[in-house]
Amino acid sequence: MYTQFFGLSEPPFSISPNPKYLYMSERHGEALAHLNYGLQDGGGFVLLTGEVGTGKTTVSRCLLQQLPTETEIAYILNPSLTERDLLAAICDEFQLPYDKDAGLKLLFDLIRDHLLANLAAGKRSVVLVDEAQHLLPGVLEQLRLLTNLETDEKKLLQVVLIGQPELQQMLRQPLLRQLAQRITARYHLLPLSHQDVDAYVRFRLQVAGCVQPIFTPKALQTLHRLSGGIPRLINLICDRALIAAFARGSHKIVHGDISLAAYEVSGIRDEGTWQSGLMVALAGALLVATGWWGWQFFGFFPERPVIKVEVPVKVDDTPEQQEQLTRAINQALEPDSAMQNLYKVWGYQTELEEATCDNAPRAGLRCQEGDASLAELQALQHPALISLTDETGGIYYATLVNLGPDKANLLIGNQSWQVDRQWLSDFWGGSYTLLWRMPKGGVALIGNNAGATQVQWLDNALSRALQQPDRKVRRFDAELKNKLQQFQREQGLNPDGIAGSNTLLRLNVMAGEPMPKLEDESQRASTPATPDTMNDEPMVTLSEEAS
């Protein structure tokens, strides 16, 4: 309908998968690199998660195309299966004949024999499960049992799980802890940034034959805001916006076209009216002198030095303090305030709804989620958002800012608490979310193909951490790889010679990068990194006996 009007060979924003419209953003590239590394490492499970429409299937298709030709793949698209159905589906994908009445053991044995035959023939075997958040715990356990099949040197089967964020929550269940421990690579795919949305739209238009910029800058800003950076929503909104512009006879897509299209697609009404725009402009004129204008655009105050304040006064355990804890818990039943406190510890004042992992790259940070023991979390040396269990089994959230041999400091709601380390161990389930500083260029993976800026940063950081002299370097050479592997071995990491998120996170600490640290406050020359908004609050002490 509108293609000829805009000089297009075909509709550029169809939601049907088409390889020629494949746009790999930096985040999609990172996800693909992590999955490839996990499969090359020979581990049991590789995990990719992301919200609906962020491009998980796009990444999985690229992964399948990049696998060696000697790889046999079982692609499971309908994971709403029983344990037997799963094994039967894998047999179907591997083209293994079986009797329709075959039970679990027979199907399992068929798959085992086939995996052994593939190994003898020099082939790799991979099972890829899409929409894996729909798998039942028993089915996930059956997959784990399949990955138990191994020789002295390698596993016979690797499994790629792709799903929505609920999959991460599922894997934190105690009954699935053995499976979670076998995940050798994981990546959470975030929505596109504003810059990526701009590039994504231009790319799809160019593929369809349009070389002129037909979306105005304001339209692209509105598109990013109303789509949330979700590629599927971007496609739907852009398609409707092209229709709207065509209907009014304009060759330019403007802010109003995007707003109308977004409302038609998702029912989201754009609150960015002229009245609110005027208020922002007036507020900006008043606040620019104090540096708050950046918050209007980015959701954060400008970066400040890491906040360090005086240790609050400790209070003895009393029934009143137990009641105070109950009140604090009631204000911390959602993770929002704990995440906001985590940003404050890093020196960023942000609105509650802006304090999310998705917004971390705006501040030059990355989110990392995982499971660990207290000792493992302490080794990471980063303050973290943690979930705790109260005496009734309910979940609440806190920010861990200090961790010593006997005590820990928490922020629960708007109050500081000191707890026994054993108390924390008893009531913490092991999951955490932390923020860490990205290297220059905003990348979370530095390897052979890294640019000169990232390579120089990595070499400088390794030199400081290993107490070696600095040098000039522009490419990822053998000396840099050796230094990186030495650092990884010293830190108990896999010495793969690739600086992924775990390596970069440890490197930030060892290289002395400016950051808040999760260290024992008794070892500090200064005082713990606690938000300055809590200066006047006394620290409440809670012992294990009091719990």
Curated annotation (Swiss-Prot):
A GO molecular function held by the record: ATP binding
GO cellular component: cytoplasm; plasma membrane
CDD domains: AAA (cd00009)
Biased composition range(s): Polar residues: 524-533
Stretch list, region Disordered: 512-547
Membrane topology per record: Peripheral membrane protein
Compartment(s) where it occurs, according to its Swiss-Prot or TrEMBL record: Cytoplasm; Cell membrane
Stretch forming the signal peptide: none
Coiled-coil ranges (or none): none
Positions bound to ATP: 50-57
Pfam families with a match to the protein in the record: AAA_22, GspA_C39-like, PG_binding_1
This protein's UniProt keywords: ATP-binding, Cell membrane, Cytoplasm, Membrane, Nucleotide-binding, Transport
Highest taxon listed in the record's lineage: Bacteria
InterPro entries with a match to the protein in the record: AAA+_ATPase, AAA_22, ExeA_AAA_ATPase_DNA-bind, GspA_C39-like, P-loop_NTPase, Peptidoglycan-bd-like, PGBD-like_sf, PGBDSf
Disulfide bond as UniProt keyword: no
Family the UniProt entry places it in: Belongs to the ExeA family.
Protein role: Involved in a general secretion pathway (GSP) for the export of proteins.
Name by which UniProt lists this protein: General secretion pathway protein A
Lineage start: Bacteria, Pseudomonadati, Pseudomonadota, Gammaproteobacteria, Aeromonadales
